[in-house]
Amino acid sequence: MIPGSSPKHYKIQKLTSLDKDYRQRARSLGSSSAKAKEWGCFDVSFLTLPPVIGEISITYTVMFQTDKPLVPGDKTMTLFKTTVDYVDIVSIKSKEHLAGVCLLPGALQRHGKPIGFAVQIFFDGQEVASDSVEVGILAGRKSWWTDSKIIDSPNVATREGCLVDRMKSPFQLNDLDSYEVSR
C-alpha cells in the first residue's frame, strides 16, 4: 500500500467555526492605509499517519448567505470553492497539520455571513477525508457541498477567484511554520 493512500491515514480534527473567528485583519506592512481590511480566513487542522506524504489536495467550499444583497439582482447565497495542492507533508515531529484559505475583503463585505464550510482531502485523486461545519439553513445538512439541490439552486451564485490559498494572501507570514506549504 502506498503511504497516504488509505482513509485510515487521515483525520480532520478541527475546522474554523462560523462565528466571528473567521474574520481576521491583515497586518499592514509599510502601508499608509487608515484601517486594515477584514478577510475571511478558513482553516483545517488534520492528522496524518504516514511519516511522509508526497502530495495531497484539499478542496475548500464556503457558502455565504445575505438577507439583503448589496447589489440589486445578486442572489441571497454565494458559493466559493477552490482546491489547493500541498507538497511534502511530513509527520515526523508532529502528526498534526494546518492548512487554509482566505476570502477577499470585498467578497466578505458583499456576501453576508458564512453558513457552511467544508473540506475534502484528496490523495492521488481519491477522497480520503472530509468534514464540514454548518449553521442556519444548512444546519444538519451533511455533505451539503455535494448536494445539487443546494449548490445548483437558483438562489445560489458561484464565485470563482475570491477564495485564495493562505500562502498567497497577506496572512502568509502569520505563523508561517505552522501551515503546510502549497505548490
Regions picked out by a protein language model, each given a short descriptive name:
Residues 1-35, 154, 158-183:
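Short, compositionally biased P/S/T/A/G/V-rich stretches that sit at domain boundaries
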Residues 44-50, 60-68, 123-125:
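Beta-strand elements of well-folded, non-transmembrane domains
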Residues 30-32, 57-61, 68-75, 100-102, ...:
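N-terminal non-globular segments
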Residues 77-90, 118-183:
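Short beta-strand elements
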Residues 29-46, 51-57, 96-103:
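Contiguous beta-strand segments within globular domains
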Residues 103-116:
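Short glycine/proline/serine/threonine-rich loop/turn segments at secondary-structure transition edges
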Residues 48-56, 68-72, 110-111:
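A short beta-turn/strand-edge loop motif at beta-sheet boundaries
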Residues 86-106:
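Exposed aromatic-hydrophobic patches
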